[in-house]
């Protein structure tokens, strides 16, 4: 499962988007429950926002059960994700993500793309609480051999995913796109500590 990723470097064009958080800090070890940067369309305009990684629909009573992931194969049918899939799609920018492999002793791997940023398909929700509205997201994952990985979108697919008028059939087709080729390297075990959020997370084995 894609339980950790990193966003420690971004472009100037991303940093100048409306809603980009003031003082956005670099992170090397983002886990479910953390605040994450995400991109969405608001009135047809691309905007940035910050939300909790763990989807909290307005009707959810037990916030401890907020899912961090949504399976691409079933999200269009599940009540937790169905409405957000149709109306509240977003992207999670990342420099890469971590993957643990092995039978007895799992080793962490760092996976990146050709460019400086990857974009994960995701869903967002707004949770009203008193006079505050809290935003949250769920990462969409797809099967990759015996693992699950984020659903990665290229530039054209990103536009289609965010557009409010994309037909449902096209959205469902995006859920089936294969994982593109990725670069990977095995890491030391420092990243295993979820409290470590520093460049040392990427220390090679």
Labelled PLM ranges:
Residues 89-93, 121, 140:
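Residues within well-ordered beta-strands of beta-sheet-rich folds
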Residues 80-103:
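Conserved SET/PR-domain catalytic core that frames the SAM/AdoMet-binding pocket
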Residues 1-7, 13, 68, 133, ...:
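C-terminal accessory segment of soluble enzyme catalytic cores
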Residues 51-53, 111-130, 137:
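A motif-centric signal for short, conserved binding hotspots located
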Residues 89, 101-116:
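Catalytic cores of histone-lysine modification enzymes
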Residues 62, 99-106, 159-162:
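Cytochrome P450 core scaffold surrounding the K-helix E-X-X-R motif
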Residues 1-55, 168-171, 181, 198-204:
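Extreme N-terminus nucleophile/cap motif
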């Amino acid at each position: 499962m894609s339980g950790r990723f990193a966003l420690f470097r971004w472009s100037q064009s991303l940093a100048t988007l409306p809603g980009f958080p003031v003082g956005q800090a670099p992170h090397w070890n983002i886990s479910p429950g953390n605040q994450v940067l995400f991109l969405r369309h608001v009135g047809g305009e691309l905007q940035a926002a910050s939300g909790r990684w763990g989807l909290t629909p307005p009707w959810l009573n037990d916030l401890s059960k907020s899912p961090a992931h949504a399976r691409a194969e079933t999200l269009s049918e599940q009540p937790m994700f169905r409405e957000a899939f149709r109306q509240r799609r977003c992207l999670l920018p990342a420099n890469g993500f971590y993957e643990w492999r092995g039978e007895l002793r799992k080793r962490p791997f760092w996976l990146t793309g050709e460019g400086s940023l990857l974009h994960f398909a995701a869903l967002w929700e707004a949770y009203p609480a008193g006079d505050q509205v809290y935003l949250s997201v769920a990462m969409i994952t797809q099967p990759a051999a015996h693992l699950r990985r984020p659903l990665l979108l290229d530039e054209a697919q990103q536009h289609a995913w965010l557009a409010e008028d994309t037909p449902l059939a096209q959205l469902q087709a995006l859920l089936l796109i294969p994982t593109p080729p990725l670069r990977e390297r095995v890491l030391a075990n420092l990243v295993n500590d979820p409290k470590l959020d520093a460049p040392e997370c990427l220390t090679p084995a």
